[in-house]
Amino acid sequence: MNNKTTLVVMAAGMGSRYGGLKQIDPIGPNGEIILDFSIYDAVKAGFDKAIFIIRRDIEKDFREMAGKRIENMIDTEYVFQDMDYLPAGRTVPQGRTKPWGTGHAVYCARDKADTPFALINADDYYGSSSFKLICDSLKNSDEMCMVGFKLGNTLTENGTVSRGVCETENGYLKSITEHTSLDRNSGIPLDTIVSMNMWGLTPKVFEYVERDFTEFLDNMQNPLKNEFYIPTVIDNMIHRYNYKIKVLDCTKKWYGVTYKEDRETVAKAMREKIGKGYYNGI
């Protein structure tokens, strides 16, 4: 039984498709952002602390538009995803400006996340049941896990999306394959389990993140563009080190803003939830 659990939030993404800092784009009727709803759900589920992984250049805006409210809801810490925070002996390739990716974000949190933790994207709405599923699993088991959503519950009408398509066996993750340009006509069954980067991890993961990140840096084909993703670490843990990653099935809808046009869909969904009595006192 693990008494303490932490929520680690990846909020440093540049939002290239959306064209702005979507993490701090108001979505609720009273100026709430998606993150407000996620933190509310996380606190209700039983998480004790939140760690935000951000870029230094958005710190002021992030604290102003999100941090101040969130700090009233939960114990909060910040971690900077600095380009030059790398394993010993490694340096940023000359001319590189692109962030290193989600695997590097997790690497940056290694000195702060000292309890079992859930990892999420700041700009995704996962829903209260997802946070309950993952918090209960982290508290009652030492197994790492992920929340799996049905592909059809994660698509947008406004364009194609990238998803980590999962193969499962007896309730555990067998493989995860990144598919780009998915929509309802891609030929993949809509009830296929996909990952939306909602992982339940323990501090043990950091040794694998560092090992794989070092290997990635030493073998980059394109030093200016290649990115290091957390699913790569998970896949290696399963296939190289025989780790078992439990899959927690979520049948609810996921919401996110991949395109600007998605914003109204998400805002409408949040208005409806608030109208039904969810998120009182947020």
Report the location of each language-model feature:
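Short phosphate-binding loop-to-helix
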Residues: I70-P116
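N-terminal glycine-rich phosphate-binding loop and ensuing alpha1 helix
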Residues: N2-G67, I74-T76
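Catalytic-core segments of class I nucleotidyltransferases/pyrophosphorylases
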Residues: E169-K246, R271-G275
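Short beta-strand-to-loop acidic/aromatic patch adjacent to the donor-nucleotide binding site
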Residues: T115-Y125
